[in-house]
């Protein structure tokens, strides 16, 4: 299974649409958003994902997602949010995945070393990072799709069969 991992879109319409186009072209099976969509109107851009992908579109909220109720009502029509909105535990492609916008590094390391999850996904720092622990656990921050802080607009694609990931730059 191929999973696109996006974070920190911050309402950047052009980059969201460009990422959606790449995701559709590459026949990605699922999308996970690690938070900071920002406004509920982003739904109209993510709505351009292929129907088969929208069935596997999951996300958590970030610290800049102030309109959580509206995001859940609007974007929630195509994106599945966890009950608390902040942390998601899901199984996709036979892999157990933990998603949170801004866990502390110590928490990421504890989760990785516990081997309770195969993949740990985060956002918030806007810095892209792929780390593979000795036990095979992947910890990924896809960077920022918006490109506002680093000047790099990025997201990640995970191949769950190979248990590897690469960063896509727009």
Tell me the role of every PLM-derived stretch.
Residues 66-75, 112, 137-143:
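Short Pro/Gly-enriched beta-strand edge/turn motifs at strand-loop
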Residues 2-91:
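Core catalytic region of metal-dependent phosphoesterases/phosphodiesterases
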Residues 84-93, 115-116, 133-170:
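Binuclear metal-dependent phosphoesterase catalytic core
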Residues 32, 58-60, 119-121, 138-140, ...:
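Hydrophobic/aromatic beta-strand patches that form the interior of the parallel beta-sheet core
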Residues 10-14, 38-41, 64-70, 104-109, ...:
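Active-site environment of divalent metal-dependent phosphoester hydrolases
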Residues 85-125:
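Internal catalytic-core helix/loop-beta-alpha segment
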């Amino acid at each position: 299974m191929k999973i696109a991992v996006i974070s920190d879109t911050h309402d950047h319409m052009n980059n969201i649409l460009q990422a959606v186009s790449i995701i559709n072209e590459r026949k990605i099976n699922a999308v996970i958003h690690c938070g900071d969509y920002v406004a509920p109107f982003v739904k109209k851009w993510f709505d351009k994902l292929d129907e088969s992908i929208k069935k596997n579109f999951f996300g958590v909220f970030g610290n800049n997602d102030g309109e959580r109720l509206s995001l859940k009502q609007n974007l929630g029509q195509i994106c599945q949010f966890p009950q608390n909105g902040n942390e998601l535990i899901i199984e996709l492609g036979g892999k157990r995945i933990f998603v949170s916008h801004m866990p502390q590094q110590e928490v990421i390391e504890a989760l990785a070393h516990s081997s309770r999850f195969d993949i740990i996904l985060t956002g918030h720092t806007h810095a892209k990072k792929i780390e593979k622990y000795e036990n095979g656990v992947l910890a990924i921050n896809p960077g920022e799709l918006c490109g506002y802080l680093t000047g790099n607009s990025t997201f990640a694609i995970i191949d769950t069969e190979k248990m590897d990931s690469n960063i896509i730059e727009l």
